[in-house]
């Protein structure tokens, strides 16, 4: 019996979100197993996975030799290796790159389409899950396991949970929460990630940016002390030589359409507008507000005014829940 996804509805901001069960169809799960799995993944991603405990999850980047990101990965340990979650649009290309050197190691790298990814967020999300699971993650133990389920805890923009589970548990949870929770699709989780300043790397932006251009250093996603990994030289140069001039920004406002990933924006310069930046993700909320996640110059004025290209409405900068000061 398959898991049936949920119909779309406009997402809500974290401040107004009722209890919501979210089908994460736009994200995908993959695993690496085998005796060399830790050594192999350590040589491919920006974070230090050797320091990661079973109670932690990490955001890391998988880069090309020039330090440009194929994808960002949400990594956590599993019984005989690691699992990670990334945007489904980049899965195939990212796995192809990751497997390039696997022939020399005792590892198996594969997508996992058997399990289901669900998000639980909004009003009293913890209380709702406490009625279903015997243990829940928190700031101390960000990853817990209960039977067939792995639960990941996220602090921002408000407490929320990501579940990696089997079809039977996903259907059971849907049935249990159906009366009290709203059901929504991936756009709701994306909206929360945009608010949280967690970069969404889809196919249009794969291979375009170094990790620091998407604030990964502020999210604990880059170790400057670990051994070699693909792209390390360029990532280190960006830090120690100040070569990175870009950052991830959150914009909010109005627009007559929702722009696509990979589009640019326009910045107001006196009477004129100048093209700038690259959109990673955008979504329209149920109150009509547009949220945009974009990579732009890191020296923008806080009061800068933007717009979707040729649009009559404007967007402004919203502070992120973390600091870029090093």
Swiss-Prot record:
What InterPro entries is this protein classified in?
A: GcvT/YgfZ_C, tRNA-modifying_YgfZ, YgfZ/GcvT, YgfZ/GcvT_CS, YgfZ_barrel
A GO biological process of this protein is: tRNA processing
- At the top level of its lineage, which domain of life is listed? Bacteria
Which UniProt key words apply to this protein? Cytoplasm, Folate-binding, tRNA processing
State the compartments where it is located: Cytoplasm
Q: Name one GO cellular component term.
A: cytoplasm
Q: Which GO terms describe its molecular function?
A: folic acid binding
| A Pfam family per the record | YgfZ_barrel
Transmembrane intervals: none
**Cystine connections:** none
Binding sites annotated in the UniProt record for folate: 27, 189
Predominant location of this chain? cytoplasm
* Family affiliation: Belongs to the tRNA-modifying YgfZ family.
Role noted for this protein? Folate-binding protein involved in regulating the level of ATP-DnaA and in the modification of some tRNAs. It is probably a key factor in regulatory networks that act via tRNA modification, such as initiation of chromosomal replication.
What this protein is called in its record is tRNA-modifying protein YgfZ
- The species this protein was found in: Salmonella paratyphi C (strain RKS4594)
What's the gene?
Answer: ygfZ
């Amino acid at each position: 019996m398959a898991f049936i996804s949920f119909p779309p509805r406009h997402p809500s901001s974290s401040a107004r979100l009722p209890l919501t069960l979210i089908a994460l169809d736009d994200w995908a799960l993959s695993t690496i197993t085998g005796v060399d799995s830790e050594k192999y993944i350590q040589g491919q991603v920006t974070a230090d996975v050797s320091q990661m405990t079973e109670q932690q999850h990490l955001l890391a980047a998988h880069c090309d030799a020039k330090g440009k990101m194929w994808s960002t990965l949400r990594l956590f340990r599993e019984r005989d290796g690691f699992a990670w979650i990334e945007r489904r649009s980049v899965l195939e290309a990212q796995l192809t790159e990751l497997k390039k050197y696997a022939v020399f190691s005792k590892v198996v790298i594969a997508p996992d389409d058997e399990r289901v990814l669900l998000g639980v967020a909004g009003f009293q999300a913890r209380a709702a899950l406490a009625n279903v699971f015997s243990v829940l993650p928190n700031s101390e133990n960000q990853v817990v396991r209960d039977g067939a389920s792995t639960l990941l805890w996220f602090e921002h923009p408000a407490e929320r949970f990501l579940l990696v589970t089997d079809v039977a548990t996903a259907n059971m949870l849907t049935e249990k929460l159906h009366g009290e929770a709203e059901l929504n699709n991936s756009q709701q989780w994306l909206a929360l990630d945009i608010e949280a300043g967690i970069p969404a790397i889809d196919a249009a932006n794969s291979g375009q940016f170094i990790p620091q251009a998407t604030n990964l250093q502020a999210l604990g996603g880059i170790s400057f002390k670990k051994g070699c990994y693909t792209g390390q030289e360029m990532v280190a140069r960006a830090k120690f030589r100040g070569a990175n001039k870009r950052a991830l920004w959150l914009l909010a406002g109005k627009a007559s359409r929702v722009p696509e990933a990979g589009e640019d924006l326009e910045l107001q310069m006196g009477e004129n507008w100048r093209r700038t930046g690259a959109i990673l993700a955008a979504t329209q909320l149920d109150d009509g507000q547009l949220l945009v996640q974009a990579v732009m110059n890191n020296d923008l004025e806080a009061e800068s005014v933007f717009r979707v290209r040729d649009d009559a409405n404007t967007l402004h900068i919203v502070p992120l829940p973390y600091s870029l000061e090093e």
